[in-house]
Amino acid sequence: MQVILLDKIGNLGGLGDQVNVKAGYARNFLIPQGKVVMATKANVEMFETRRAELEANVAKQLAAAEARAESVNALEVTIASKSGDEGKLFGSIGNRDIADAATAAGVAIAKSEVRLPEGALRTTGSFEVSIQLHSEVFATLKLEVVAAE
């Protein structure tokens, strides 16, 4: 199914690209979220008239994400959790815990923006957590996990 991208989408392309995707992916995910429109003649003309507006929206979102990235990079968060003698935690620190701690420290982060490629944190210590604020913008959060008293 031919569609026109209204936003940058990973592994597909950028704003204005005409790409071929599976019909189910377009109908069930991309079109309901407003990320694409069908590539009909009328939609192509409509897109060309709205191109400047859409590009301005994308640039505005990117600038907002870069501003948030600067505040996240400057942030240092400490999480206290119960742990054993050797520094192993009773439980783990996951995406939600990190997002809640960062939000409590003053920078709003959604749990879906936190990237833990090696899974949840299970030991005490210092960690650098990757935060994906936009498809092109990543920030690094300094996280200290300490033993609770």
UniProtKB/Swiss-Prot annotation:
Alphabetical UniProt keywords: Ribonucleoprotein, Ribosomal protein, RNA-binding, rRNA-binding
Coiled coil: none
Cellular component annotations (GO), alphabetically ordered: ribonucleoprotein complex; ribosome
One GO molecular-function entry: rRNA binding
Listed InterPro entries: Ribosomal_bL9, Ribosomal_bL9/RNase_H1_N, Ribosomal_bL9_bac/chp, Ribosomal_bL9_C, Ribosomal_bL9_C_sf, Ribosomal_bL9_N, Ribosomal_bL9_N_sf
KW Oxidoreductase (keyword) present: no
One BP term from GO: translation
Top-rank taxon, per record: Bacteria
Function, as annotated: Binds to the 23S rRNA.
Family per similarity comment: Belongs to the bacterial ribosomal protein bL9 family.
Cross-referenced HAMAP family: Ribosomal_bL9
Identification of the protein by name: Large ribosomal subunit protein bL9
Taxonomic lineage of the native organism: Bacteria, Pseudomonadati, Pseudomonadota, Gammaproteobacteria, Vibrionales
Gene transcribed to yield this protein: rplI
